[in-house]
Structures are given as C-alpha cells and as structure tokens.
Amino acid sequence: MVLKVPTSKVLLVLATLFAVAAMISSWMPQVAASPLAPTEYEQRRMMCSTGLSDVIQKICVSGTVALGDVFPNSFGKRRKRDLQNVTDLCCKSGGCTYRELLQYCKG
C-alpha cells in the first residue's frame, strides 16, 4: 500500500532541507586554496664564510666529499672539474637548501 502525500508537504520538506543546508554551509569557514610553505629542508638560505662552514660541520657528521673522492684518477691529468663548489651554490642570492648541502657530505 502506497501512501499518498500531498505535493505541497513534499515541497515544504524539500525547501526546509535546502534552507537548513544553506545555513549550515554559511556557518562553516570557507577554505581557500593556498600554496604550502616549503618544509625546513626545502627552504633556501644564503650562507657564506663561517656560517656555511658551521652548518656543514653540523650536518656532515662523517666529513665532506673531497675532489679526490669524486675524481680519484685525475692526478696529473688536465681535466675540467664540473663539480660546483658549495660556496658557489650557497653564497649567492639564491642560496641553497639543506638537501643540496647533503650532497657534499660523505656517505
């Protein structure tokens, strides 16, 4: 057996539900999209001189990579070394990140 509900009551219930939903959505804070801030490891910082040296000594516990480690058979040979110096990277206006500094650490 199917109940017959007057159309006006159905419309009244739907209108009430719509009004309640509209009020609830206006109470909730609107979320705006914004870019995420870079993590501590990805923030670029300009470091030079003793400041850069101190940071490298703190993060490179087992020491830094020497050019002899990178180019073991280059003694006596003329070869352009394309490895960028850490000061070339960090002591310029762009600065460097923690992850980039880790490339200069051993192991």
Swiss-Prot record:
Gene3D superfamilies: Insulin-like (1.10.100.10). The keyword S-adenosyl-L-methionine does not apply. Expressed at a low level in the larval gut. It is found in: Secreted. One of its GO terms (cellular component) is extracellular region. Disulfide bonds join C48-C91, C60-C105, C90-C96. Residues 1-33 form the signal peptide. It comes from the Eukaryota. Its main location: secreted. One of its GO terms (molecular function) is insulin receptor binding. InterPro entries: Insulin-like_sf. Residues 67-76 form a propeptide. Keywords: Cleavage on pair of basic residues, Disulfide bond, Secreted, Signal. GO terms for biological process: cellular response to starvation; insulin receptor signaling pathway; positive regulation of multicellular organism growth; response to starvation. Belongs to the insulin family. Possible ligand of InR/insulin-like receptor. Heterodimer of a B chain and an A chain linked by two disulfide bonds. This is Insulin-like peptide 6. The gene is Ilp6.
